[in-house]
């Protein structure tokens, strides 16, 4: 009876050990302007599909595509069937668990490029900022996904600058890239690439790519995606504009790929551009592309339709399948590419079409902002709704100089407190107004929206406040803090781990590494299985 009850447990344990011990996908690395597998140095081309369903039936602002294992189980076979090796996801809910979907994707050999923003937390092209709220959002996604080796990279922005009148917004996205890369490094995570996804505006596209690729490695984008919809119906390399784009980007210096493609002006889409994209004319410059998109919706870009949780492939799916399965791109080796003549891109000069400063916004620093807030006498009252902040800003900044909280991506001039939370910035200008009105009690009221507090300045804050100056027009060099994001429930490993993001940084310093918890689990279960098998052998039920 003992052996009967023990034997299934032994088999289960050994099966689980086999599952946990399975190799993670090798991380994808960058050398020159190409992607390579980290384990063997062979070139990696993106054969991707955008995978995010619009929110139709929920009060939430978006649907997390990797938080529903049943949907992943339903869809991944259809992704596999068309040789998909990358999906792009546009918004992730950091309060959800993604372990099962990420594991299923890994088992299918599929990598993920994830946008760091979400609809309610992104850089606004019309009023751009890079502040603590966004920094905490971006780093929370990094914390959640850093230890999955099938995370290929992150997008810090998508079509933020989309025409010549808002090129200043790119300075804020580039600051986001800089600080996200610094955060990854400071946490000891593996080196995950961070890039940008642009639209295809002929007036700015070359300057846009050059801007993100130029400068010091610490602040430059690691890769560049372009949402390309020029090839419609039966076109050609020249007629589609692909030839022109390839010439435009041939010296970019970082990997470039189509972060979206698949014009639907002619349907069904036959995807005749696939052979060209992965052909010899384009592969020296381009690293593949991501078809837009998996789900059929009102915009008519889908490869499949889903009704009552049942997948039906569309004609586009069949055409894409036949094209993507027939590609044979040439393959470079990382060892040869390292000796390439491709060098760092030169930053674009300011013109009528391009006005983004190479002087980037300061790093959001929670400690600096907290020091400033504590030093104030007049602050916004806690009962004031954040929706009312804009009216208060408008009123105050019409009466005093608010440059200490403002940021200008064209001139490259940024107030010392421009990266702070809105509440802290509002308190700062309220206090300025109060001081400029000789600290009259009525000057700290604003219709009951402000109140007085006892100002405090800790010794550790003196240097910050001195550098910023009383008006906030000085310069404070913010520091990337590693304690801003909350712990999450995801395992953070391609091969299930029980450690949270807050405790796993030391176990993920190299590509493809298992988390400490996974290693412990494997070792423990191996010992259990070994003991169990020894017992069975000892009873003579198995001969060795």
Swiss-Prot record:
The keyword Phosphoprotein does not apply. InterPro entries: Glucanosyltransferase, Glycoside_hydrolase_SF, X8. It comes from Candida albicans (strain SC5314 / ATCC MYA-2876) (Yeast). Residues 1-22 form the signal peptide. GO terms for biological process: fungal-type cell wall (1->3)-beta-D-glucan biosynthetic process; fungal-type cell wall organization. It is found in: Cell membrane. Residues 469-514 are annotated as: Disordered. Induction: Repressed at pH values above 6 and progressively induced at more acidic pH values. Belongs to the glycosyl hydrolase 72 family. GO terms for cellular component: cell surface; extracellular vesicle; fungal-type cell wall; hyphal cell wall; plasma membrane; side of membrane; yeast-form cell wall. This is pH-responsive protein 2. Its main location: membrane. Glycans are attached at residues 40, 59, 147, 408. Required for apical cell growth and plays an essential role in morphogenesis. May be integral to the pathogenic ability of the organism. Disulfide bonds join 72-101, 214-347, 232-263, 369-420, 378-444, 397-402. The keyword Signal applies.
